[in-house]
From Swiss-Prot:
Belongs to the UPF0161 family. This is Putative membrane protein insertion efficiency factor. PANTHER family: MEMBRANE PROTEIN INSERTION EFFICIENCY FACTOR-RELATED (PTHR33383:SF1). Could be involved in insertion of integral membrane proteins into the membrane. It comes from Neisseria meningitidis serogroup B (strain ATCC BAA-335 / MC58).
Length: 73
């Protein structure tokens, strides 16, 4: 189950990276970008924990949040 959800999440993230992201200006305050962070988190921890880490990261990515290098733990 987790494997299938991971593949689904990775597919959705890749769709965003290749089809939607090129149409909007770069806004991510972190490196790696939030979408790349999500890919790495899901690959490393699976759909549930990786997805939770990705959501927390995206929630921090705003003008009053942090910035700089923030790798997947």
């Amino acid at each position: 189950m987790n494997f299938l959800l991971s593949k689904l999440l990775l597919g959705l993230i890749r769709f965003y990276q290749y089809c939607i992201s090129p149409l909007i200006p770069p806004r991510c305050r972190y490196t790696p970008t939030c979408s790349q962070y999500a890919v790495e988190a899901v690959k490393k921890y699976g759909a549930f924990k990786g997805g939770r880490l990705a959501i927390k990261r995206i929630a921090r990515c705003h003008p009053f949040g942090g910035h700089g290098h923030d790798p997947v733990p």
